[in-house]
Structures are given as structure tokens and as C-alpha cells.
Regions:
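Alpha-helical membrane insertion/targeting regions
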Residues: 1-185
């Protein structure tokens, strides 16, 4: 969230870095929507709040649209990518995960409409894992830079992908643990 706020400030404050409206508006939408999704979504993992059905339902009615706006604006930014050619692969990785996030949010809505609460929780966990991958990417970049030095464009692509994959893997572990129930023995 802090990174998004700083990026939004950078885009709006510096006339030299003025982006065309085709990019500036989606960046603003993405940062605001993703911030809402990540902050409000964190509270959905609290059993005490999740068990308060009216709160959980109202929060979900904000989270789903925020998540879809975040995912679709990220997809838009990847499709209309206007950065250096060597960064195109990184944009395509982001596109894949933006589309995946939108898809899992749709699956979460379908699951809750069927009153399949376990599937809904699993799909929302996957969406949240993708959404908060920026933090994991920052950690991976920092560890890489401290260990091996600066990252080139090719390395950036792999590190961005690593952040998404790490979060997705952890989400699947949490989902399996949740559905497996307590271990006997």
C-alpha cells in the first residue's frame, strides 16, 4: 500500500513524468482499488470478524468490486504497456496474474452464490495471495540485490514471477491445511 501511495504521488506530482491519461487513470484506479482490497481483505482473515456475517457480507460487497477494479486495471496497464522493450516480459507476467486474479474473484462469487463457503474461502485466499504479491516481490528483490547485486530486466521478470508463485504456493498450503482439518494422532 505504501509503495502504491508513493507511486501515485510520484505520478501526480512530477510534471516531467506525466503519463498520458490512458495510463495515469488506470494507475490511479489500480493503486486505490488494490489498497482497499489489501487493507479490507486482511480483516476477512480474522475469525472473529468473519463470523460476524453481516460485517463479512458488507465487506465482501466492497472487496469483490475493488479486487476486480484492481485486477482489470492491472491487465489494462500490461496490455497498453509503453515501457522499455526489455521490460515487456515482466508486464506479461503481471498480465497473467491480473487475469488469474479476476478469474478467481469470479469463482469466489460463483461459490458464494452456491453457498459453498469452503470454496468461496479458497478462491478469496487465492485472490488475496495474488493481490499482496507486491510485498513479496519487494522482499525477493531486496534479498536478491543484497546477495547478488542489481537486477537486470530479465532478472526482474523472474523475480516478479517468483513473488506471485511464492504467494500462490503459500495460499495453496493454507487452503489444504484448512480443508484437511485437525490431524489425528
Amino acid at each position: 500500500v505504501l509503495g502504491g501511495v508513493l507511486r501515485l504521488r510520484e505520478v501526480t506530482a512530477d510534471p516531467a513524468s506525466a503519463l498520458p491519461l490512458a495510463s495515469a487513470a488506470p494507475i490511479g484506479v489500480h493503486i486505490v482499488a488494490m489498497s482497499v482490497f489489501c487493507c479490507l481483505g486482511a480483516f476477512q482473515f480474522s475469525p472473529a470478524l468473519r463470523n460476524r456475517r453481516s460485517w463479512h457480507r458488507r465487506a465482501g460487497r466492497v472487496l469483490i468490486p475493488a479486487g476486480l477494479f484492481a485486477a482489470l486495471s492491472a491487465a489494462w496497464l500490461a496490455v497498453v504497456f509503453s515501457g522499455p522493450t526489455e521490460e515487456l516480459a515482466s508486464a506479461m507476467v503481471r498480465l497473467v496474474f491480473a487475469v488469474a486474479m479476476a478469474g478467481v474473484l469470479v469463482q469466489a462469487v460463483i461459490a458464494i452464490k452456491r453457498r459453498d463457503f469452503a470454496a468461496h474461502a479458497a478462491w478469496m485466499t487465492r485472490a488475496y495471495a495474488i493481490a499482496v504479491s507486491g510485498g513479496t516481490q519487494a522482499l525477493v528483490f531486496t534479498l536478491w540485490t543484497l546477495t547478488f547485486g542489481e537486477v537486470d530486466a530479465s532478472g526482474e521478470t523472474w523475480l516478479v514471477a517468483a513473488g506471485f508463485v511464492i504467494n500462490s504456493f503459500v495460499a495453496e498450503l493454507l487452503i489444504r491445511r484448512r480443508t484437511a482439518g485437525p490431524m489425528n494422532g
